Amino acid sequence: MLINKIKQDNRTLRPEIQRWGCYFLCLHYYTSLFKKREFNAYEINVAYYRFIGLGYIKSNCFIINPCMMLNYYGIRSSVRYESFGYLGTANEFEISEVKIDKVNGYHFIATKNKEILYDSLDLKPLRKIFKVT
Protein backbone atom coordinates (compact mmCIF):
# COMPACT_ATOMS: atom_id res chain seq x y z
CA MET A 1 0.00 0.00 0.00
CA LEU A 2 1.31 3.42 -0.81
CA ILE A 3 2.09 5.33 2.36
CA ASN A 4 -0.06 8.26 1.23
CA LYS A 5 -3.04 5.91 1.52
CA ILE A 6 -2.23 5.14 5.18
CA LYS A 7 -3.97 7.64 7.44
CA GLN A 8 -4.04 7.99 11.20
CA ASP A 9 -7.61 6.68 11.33
CA ASN A 10 -6.43 3.28 10.00
CA ARG A 11 -7.56 0.90 12.75
CA THR A 12 -4.73 -1.51 11.95
CA LEU A 13 -2.21 1.03 13.23
CA ARG A 14 -1.18 1.08 16.88
CA PRO A 15 -3.43 3.40 18.93
CA GLU A 16 -0.43 5.64 19.67
CA ILE A 17 0.19 6.11 15.94
CA GLN A 18 -3.51 6.78 15.35
CA ARG A 19 -3.45 9.47 18.00
CA TRP A 20 0.00 11.09 17.72
CA GLY A 21 1.75 9.56 14.70
CA CYS A 22 1.60 12.39 12.16
CA TYR A 23 5.33 13.23 12.21
CA PHE A 24 6.24 9.54 12.33
CA LEU A 25 4.06 8.89 9.27
CA CYS A 26 5.53 11.91 7.44
CA LEU A 27 9.01 10.44 7.87
CA HIS A 28 7.73 7.19 6.36
CA TYR A 29 6.13 9.14 3.53
CA TYR A 30 9.53 10.60 2.61
CA THR A 31 11.20 7.21 3.01
CA SER A 32 8.63 5.79 0.62
CA LEU A 33 9.21 8.64 -1.82
CA PHE A 34 13.02 8.60 -1.79
CA LYS A 35 13.56 4.85 -1.56
CA LYS A 36 10.62 3.78 -3.75
CA ARG A 37 9.51 1.60 -0.87
CA GLU A 38 5.91 0.85 -0.02
CA PHE A 39 4.78 0.34 3.57
CA ASN A 40 1.68 -1.33 4.90
CA ALA A 41 0.15 -0.71 8.32
CA TYR A 42 1.83 -3.82 9.76
CA GLU A 43 5.27 -2.55 8.69
CA ILE A 44 4.53 0.86 10.18
CA ASN A 45 3.65 -0.82 13.49
CA VAL A 46 6.86 -2.88 13.38
CA ALA A 47 8.87 0.29 12.71
CA TYR A 48 7.16 1.96 15.68
CA TYR A 49 8.41 -0.76 18.05
CA ARG A 50 11.84 -0.88 16.39
CA PHE A 51 12.39 2.86 16.77
CA ILE A 52 11.19 2.84 20.38
CA GLY A 53 13.70 0.06 21.07
CA LEU A 54 16.48 2.02 19.38
CA GLY A 55 15.57 5.16 21.34
CA TYR A 56 14.62 7.21 18.26
CA ILE A 57 11.01 7.83 19.38
CA LYS A 58 9.00 7.71 22.58
CA SER A 59 5.93 5.48 22.96
CA ASN A 60 3.68 8.51 22.36
CA CYS A 61 5.33 8.96 18.92
CA PHE A 62 7.38 11.95 20.06
CA ILE A 63 10.30 11.93 17.63
CA ILE A 64 13.64 12.10 19.44
CA ASN A 65 15.94 11.55 16.48
CA PRO A 66 14.40 11.85 13.00
CA CYS A 67 17.81 11.68 11.32
CA MET A 68 18.55 8.25 12.79
CA MET A 69 15.11 7.02 11.72
CA LEU A 70 15.79 8.10 8.14
CA ASN A 71 19.34 6.76 8.38
CA TYR A 72 17.89 3.34 9.25
CA TYR A 73 16.32 3.35 5.77
CA GLY A 74 19.52 4.58 4.12
CA ILE A 75 18.63 8.27 3.90
CA ARG A 76 21.35 10.62 5.11
CA SER A 77 19.80 13.80 6.44
CA SER A 78 20.05 16.69 8.84
CA VAL A 79 17.23 18.58 10.52
CA ARG A 80 16.74 22.23 11.23
CA TYR A 81 13.85 24.50 12.11
CA GLU A 82 12.98 27.24 9.63
CA SER A 83 10.51 30.08 9.91
CA PHE A 84 7.13 30.10 8.18
CA GLY A 85 8.19 31.89 4.99
CA TYR A 86 11.16 29.65 4.19
CA LEU A 87 11.05 27.91 0.81
CA GLY A 88 13.11 24.75 0.60
CA THR A 89 15.75 24.17 -2.05
CA ALA A 90 15.55 21.38 -4.61
CA ASN A 91 17.43 18.88 -2.43
CA GLU A 92 15.46 19.59 0.76
CA PHE A 93 12.21 18.18 2.06
CA GLU A 94 9.83 19.69 4.57
CA ILE A 95 7.65 18.59 7.42
CA SER A 96 5.46 21.54 8.37
CA GLU A 97 3.81 22.19 11.71
CA VAL A 98 0.15 23.18 11.45
CA LYS A 99 -2.35 24.46 13.98
CA ILE A 100 -5.88 23.10 13.57
CA ASP A 101 -8.64 25.53 14.54
CA LYS A 102 -10.20 24.71 17.93
CA VAL A 103 -7.84 21.77 18.58
CA ASN A 104 -5.14 21.75 21.27
CA GLY A 105 -1.65 20.90 20.07
CA TYR A 106 -0.17 20.73 16.59
CA HIS A 107 -0.21 18.45 13.57
CA PHE A 108 2.57 17.76 11.05
CA ILE A 109 2.26 17.40 7.28
CA ALA A 110 4.73 16.75 4.46
CA THR A 111 4.97 19.83 2.25
CA LYS A 112 6.98 21.28 -0.61
CA ASN A 113 6.87 25.04 -1.21
CA LYS A 114 3.52 25.33 0.57
CA GLU A 115 1.98 22.41 -1.36
CA ILE A 116 0.66 19.57 0.81
CA LEU A 117 2.23 16.30 -0.28
CA TYR A 118 0.99 14.09 2.55
CA ASP A 119 -1.41 14.70 5.42
CA SER A 120 -2.16 11.74 7.66
CA LEU A 121 -5.39 13.39 8.87
CA ASP A 122 -6.64 14.55 5.44
CA LEU A 123 -7.58 17.96 6.82
CA LYS A 124 -8.53 19.61 3.50
CA PRO A 125 -11.07 16.98 2.36
CA LEU A 126 -12.58 17.11 5.86
CA ARG A 127 -12.84 20.90 5.49
CA LYS A 128 -10.90 21.46 8.71
CA ILE A 129 -9.58 24.96 9.22
CA PHE A 130 -5.82 24.97 9.80
CA LYS A 131 -2.75 27.10 9.19
CA VAL A 132 0.95 26.39 8.87
CA THR A 133 2.80 27.90 11.84
Located regions from the model:
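Active-site-adjacent substructure of cysteine-protease-like catalytic cores
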Residues: R76-E115
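Helix-adjacent hinge/juxtasegments
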Residues: Y49-R80
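Noncatalytic regulatory segments and standalone regulatory/sensor domains
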Residues: T89-E92, K112-T133
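Residues in well-ordered beta-strands of folded domains
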Residues: N4, E97, Y118
